[in-house]
């Protein structure tokens, strides 16, 4: 008997994108799976429309947008409560190869020391280009980075690799592990929550693995770009706020004491460059967002005042 997998998708006003993802998932070879779609406070009726079109999926409805973390946590909670063996978190703006889940489950079953595994991820617009070929962390610099971004697939990306953190675009983990670590940090809302969970899993002694033979394709950018350009560009100031605030939270939580001086200096320099760029380009709403992110990141303030960073189109 195959281990059971709950495939967790979060939909927010994205009927076409989520529908394409579900259609792709219907072609997978792994039989013992259930698609669990969390409708994250959609205002366009897309959640109910998708359930009507795909009655076999499980629909969980949230009255409000709980962010990437809160939405996926609703799916994790359902998966754990229903007794699934595994949870697969999958961004709704993805397409999958039919055998992608077979590879991930079989690898986890054969390697009990592995706590979480991710597929090889390509861009969807050009499937010859990688989006993520493994993710790493420099504790001395306090920087997160991925390998292979926007590069052609080569031999080094076709090898199994232990990585420092797993992208939240797609990963498989055991529910028994989630019971120990806890779920995604809800106060992070979105961005770097995958890093935080990865570090918690690693702290339990598990390995984090990149699987080169499990392949998916990512549209990318759905969560951080608006469809129309505002006065300060396509990227909402909230994105910059959350990215920098959560970056500082991670640094405070996970930087070893002996790396604090170098990591602090590098991140002061990096954030100063961002602020300088916004000042020169006269993107003052975004500049204000980054300043607030630094204050809240250092103080530990949790509730972001999103309204402060809204910009007029």
Language model: regions and residue ranges:
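Acidic helix N-cap motif at the loop->helix transition within catalytic regions
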Residues: 19, 44-52
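Short, acidic, metal-binding catalytic loop of nucleotide-sugar glycosyltransferases
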Residues: 23-32
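Glycine-rich, basic loop-to-helix element that forms the pyrophosphate-binding segment
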Residues: 61-82
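Short beta-strand-to-loop acidic/aromatic patch adjacent to the donor-nucleotide binding site
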Residues: 84-95
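Conserved donor NDP-sugar-binding/catalytic core segment of glycosyltransferases
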Residues: 95-131, 137-138
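Short, flexible, basic/aromatic active-site loop/helix in glycosyltransferases
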Residues: 138-164
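A short, conserved alpha-helix in the catalytic core of glycosyltransferases
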Residues: 164-183, 187-217
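Non-catalytic, C-terminal membrane-associated alpha-helical segments of glycosyltransferases
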Residues: 256-313
């Amino acid at each position: 008997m195959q281990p059971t997998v709950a495939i967790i998708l979060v939909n927010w006003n994205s009927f076409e994108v989520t529908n394409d993802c579900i259609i792709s998932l219907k072609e997978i070879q792994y039989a013992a799976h259930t698609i669990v779609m969390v409708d994250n406070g959609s205002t366009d009726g897309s959640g109910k429309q998708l359930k009507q079109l795909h009655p076999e999926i499980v629909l969980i409805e949230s009255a409000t947008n709980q962010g990437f973390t809160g939405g996926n946590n609703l799916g994790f909670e359902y998966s754990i409560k229903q007794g699934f063996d595994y949870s697969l978190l999958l961004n709704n703006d993805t397409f999958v190869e039919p055998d992608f889940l077979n590879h991930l489950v079989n690898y986890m079953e054969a390697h009990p020391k592995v706590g979480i595994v991710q597929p090889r991820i390509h861009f969807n617009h050009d499937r010859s280009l990688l989006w993520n070929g493994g993710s790493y962390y420099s504790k001395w610099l306090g920087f997160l980075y991925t390998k292979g971004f926007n590069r052609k697939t080569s031999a080094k990306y076709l090898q199994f690799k232990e990585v420092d953190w797993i992208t939240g675009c797609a990963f498989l983990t055991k529910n028994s592990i989630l019971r120990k670590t806890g779920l995604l940090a809800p106060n992070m809302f979105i961005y770097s929550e995958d890093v935080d969970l990865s570090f918690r899993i690693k702290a339990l002694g598990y390995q984090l693995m990149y699987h080169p033979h499990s392949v998916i394709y990512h549209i990318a950018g759905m969560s951080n770009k608006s469809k129309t350009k505002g006065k300060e560009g396509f990227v909402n100031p909230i994105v910059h706020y959350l990215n920098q605030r959560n970056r500082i939270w991670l640094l405070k939580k996970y930087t070893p004491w002996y790396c604090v001086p170098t990591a602090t200096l590098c991140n002061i320099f990096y954030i100063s460059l961002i602020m300088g760029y916004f000042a020169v380009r006269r993107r003052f709403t975004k500049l204000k967002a980054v300043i607030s992110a630094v204050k809240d990141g250092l103080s530990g303030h949790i509730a972001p005042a999103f309204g402060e960073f809204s910009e007029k189109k």
